[in-house]
């Protein structure tokens, strides 16, 4: 009996971890942070319970979109080394279970957000889930090299959701946070595509290096990085401690530009990887700086 229980427990734990990975937790962490940032810097107050509900709905919505994405992309995930060990291509979760979970979490997160927080936040969450799941995953990703540019709209909405959870309205401040994420997304994913462009080509995904070449991709990374740097200076105009923010944001942005320039002037795998790795840490730290500078 004990040996049977000991066998069952690891299986249960592994199954839970597989479903957790289906929700793309690394993306979820960043989405939740940006949503919380929108809540914190918004004028006015929000009941702690409502803030928790809003945060959970944003997390569930992100997970729902991740599950639907993995369901639809399981065929191409199986072709790429980077993604072949994901739950569905690895045979750990069935496609039907994945889509069922994604749809259930979508309905729950949007419904609870509408009822418990407000309608505009629920509508924005529905748009974010729908845009990522349908516009990006099912249409843009396999049809245009601008897939991550347009698809980046979905990932840039959460700070607006956080803001509207408090104010029930959209303002210029929340749109600036939206723009930061929107401009960050292309250089982040283009760095990844430089690392894996042969696999994208094999899977017939029209990423920019596949359709327009490596040099054009490098130019795009540099241009978007410059525009991103300029936009990241704007939150200092409305944050309480603008000096603290700029002291954080400017060095972060210069380092981002440094990595982008290194990518532009080099064909070194490790330069591409350094750009991709730094871009993840960059956005986390930048939004933490925004939070700290709001007090």
Swiss-Prot record:
**Pathway given in the UniProt record:** Porphyrin-containing compound metabolism; heme O biosynthesis; heme O from protoheme: step 1/1
The primary site where this protein sits is membrane
Q: Which molecular function term from Gene Ontology is one that the record holds? A: protoheme IX farnesyltransferase activity
Instruction: Tell me the InterPro entries matching this sequence.
Output: Protohaem_IX_farnesylTrfase, UbiA_prenyltransferase, UbiA_prenylTrfase_CS, UbiA_sf
The record lists its disulfide bonds as: none
The organism sits in which domain of life?
Bacteria
- Mark the transmembrane ranges: 27-46, 50-72, 93-115, 119-136, 148-168, 175-195, 219-239, 244-264, 275-295
Pfam families per record:
UbiA (PF01040)
What EC designation does it have?
2.5.1.141
> What is the stated purpose of this protein?
Converts heme B (protoheme IX) to heme O by substitution of the vinyl group on carbon 2 of heme B porphyrin ring with a hydroxyethyl farnesyl side group.
Q: Which family does it belong to?
A: Belongs to the UbiA prenyltransferase family. Protoheme IX farnesyltransferase subfamily.
Query: What is noted besides the main data?
Result: Carbon 2 of the heme B porphyrin ring is defined according to the Fischer nomenclature.
Q: What is this protein called?
A: Protoheme IX farnesyltransferase
């Amino acid at each position: 009996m004990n040996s049977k229980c000991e066998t069952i427990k690891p299986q249960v734990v592994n199954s839970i971890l597989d479903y957790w990975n289906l929700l793309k937790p690394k993306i979820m962490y960043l989405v939740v942070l940006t949503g919380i940032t929108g809540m914190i810097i918004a004028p006015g107050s929000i009941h702690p319970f409502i803030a928790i509900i809003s945060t959970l709905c944003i997390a569930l919505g992100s997970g729902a979109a991740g599950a639907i994405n993995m369901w639809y992309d399981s065929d191409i995930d199986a072709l790429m080394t980077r993604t072949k060990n994901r739950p569905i291509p690895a045979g750990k979760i069935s496609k039907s279970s994945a889509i069922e979970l994604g749809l259930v979490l979508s309905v729950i997160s949007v419904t609870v957000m509408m009822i418990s927080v407000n309608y505009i936040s629920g509508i924005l969450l529905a748009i974010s889930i729908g845009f990522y799941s349908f516009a990006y995953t099912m249409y843009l990703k396999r049809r245009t090299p601008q897939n991550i540019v347009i698809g980046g709209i979905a990932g840039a909405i959460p700070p607006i959701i956080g803001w509207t959870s408090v104010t029930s309205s959209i303002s210029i401040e929340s749109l600036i946070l939206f723009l930061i994420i929107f401009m960050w997304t292309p250089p982040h994913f283009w760095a990844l595509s430089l690392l894996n462009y042969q696999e994208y080509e094999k899977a017939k995904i029209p990423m920019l290096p596949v359709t327009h070449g490596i040099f054009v991709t490098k130019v795009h990374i540099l241009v978007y990085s410059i525009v991103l740097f300029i936009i990241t200076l704007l939150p200092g105009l409305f944050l309480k401690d603008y000096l603290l923010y700029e002291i954080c944001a400017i060095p972060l942005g210069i380092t981002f530009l440094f990595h982008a320039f290194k990518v532009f002037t080099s064909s070194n795998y490790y330069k591409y990887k350094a750009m991709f790795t730094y871009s993840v840490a960059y956005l986390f730290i930048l939004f933490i700086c925004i939070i700290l500078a709001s007090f």
